[in-house]
Amino acid sequence: MSESSDISAMQPVNPKPFLKGLVNHRVGVKLKFNSTEYRGTLVSTDNYFNLQLNEAEEFVAGVSHGTLGEIFIRCNNVLYIRELPN
């Protein structure tokens, strides 16, 4: 299957129920810049889609740069959010 057909097979997801379902789950949050991703447990989200993570770890270009603990990510910096396996 080609990449374009993979993309066309994706179904749109309503973001509010999607994020609500990820609370208390491990997630990866990719930022729009610097190839930065934060991985941690989603504690909460608000109506603007700002995110609070606990036990967060920072990755730049796939390399861990340490554990940060509890962090807040402003919504306009987020490229995508994905659920991580436990």
UniProtKB/Swiss-Prot annotation:
Residue ranges annotated for the Sm domain, each copy included: 14-86
Annotated keywords: Cytoplasm, mRNA processing, mRNA splicing, Nucleus, Ribonucleoprotein, RNA-binding, Spliceosome
SUPFAM superfamilies linked to this entry: Sm-like ribonucleoproteins (SSF50182)
Any one Gene Ontology cellular component term annotated for this protein: U4 snRNP
Compartment(s): Nucleus; Cytoplasm
GO molecular function: poly(U) RNA binding; RNA binding; splicing factor binding
Biological process (GO), any one: U2-type prespliceosome assembly
Highest taxon of the lineage: Eukaryota
Quaternary structure, from the entry: Component of the Sm core complex, present in spliceosomal snRNP U1, U2, U4/U6 and U5. The core complex contains SMB1, SMD1, SMD2, SMD3, SME1, SMX3 and SMX2 (Sm proteins B, D1, D2, D3, E, F and G, respectively), and is probably a heptameric ring structure. SMX3 specifically interacts with SME1.
Role summary: Plays a role in pre-mRNA splicing as a core component of the spliceosomal U1, U2, U4 and U5 small nuclear ribonucleoproteins (snRNPs), the building blocks of the spliceosome.
Further details from the record: Present with 2570 molecules/cell in log phase SD medium.
Name of the protein in question: Small nuclear ribonucleoprotein F
Organism: Saccharomyces cerevisiae (strain ATCC 204508 / S288c)
Taxonomic path: Eukaryota, Fungi, Dikarya, Ascomycota, Saccharomycotina
Protein's gene: SMX3
